[in-house]
Amino acid sequence: MNTIDTTDPEATVINVAPAKTALRHWTLAREPDGLAVLVFDKAGTTSNTLSAEALGELNHVLDRLEREKPRALLIRSGKAGGFIAGAEIDELGAIATEAGAVALVKRGWDTFERLAAVGYPTLALIRGYCLGGGLELALACRYRVAVDEPGTRLGLPEVMLGIVPGWGGIKRLPRLAGAPAALDLMLTGRTVDARKAKKLGIVDEAVPMRIMENTARGVLKALLPPRTLPLPLSLTLPPRPKSA
């Protein structure tokens, strides 16, 4: 597999100026070759959860990327301890009506449908816990690279709360892992490590932490079509007529 040397000056991230909508939880950056890097670092907490505000911001990011047309998108966590723990439990507990429950499910479902439908390659770089809505976000990406270390766990534990994966995991996980394995994970709520996730087909690669960045970037950059360079001016001008 091709890898990218992240010490190369050409791989330096170029920060993008904020759009009209300021982002509290996500940071979007662009690299010289057109790769976009989206970092989720939920403000004011030590763990990432997908609150209504965080999902709303993700939609704004997708709006922006629809305009800016990146060549590929890498999604990762800004937290040292994990990728995404899932939905915001406090918001789930505050739902008092059927309409409120439907709105919450629709918000996440529609957002991840948008992510799954983008026209450029997408990859989730997973280190640490990747649970519930976090795994559903990763499943909406085209590729997934997980870090092979004890803290990395993937699963859909919503069943412990009496709910099912409502943000797309219920249809995407069986496509990757097969119906028996997917049902086992969804009905028991158990989690798997990176190696087991790769064996099941949930992730594409399970790699050591030291090469996680190179592997993720290498997967995406190997998919990018070569850039077309303009021809030298001498080759684009019509030939001069021969002098008499």
Whereabouts are the PLM-identified features?
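Intrinsically disordered, low-complexity segments enriched in small/flexible residues
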Residues: N2-L23, A52-L55, N59-V61, L176, ...
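Glycine- (often His-adjacent) and acidic-residue-rich active-site loop
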Residues: E68, S77-T111, C130, M160-G162
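Receiver (REC) domain switch/active-site residues of two-component response regulators
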Residues: R142, V203-D204
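Conserved CoA-thioester-binding segment of acyl-CoA-metabolizing enzymes
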Residues: N2-R76, E113
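Hydrophobic/aromatic residues within transmembrane alpha-helices
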Residues: I75, E88, L137-A138, A197
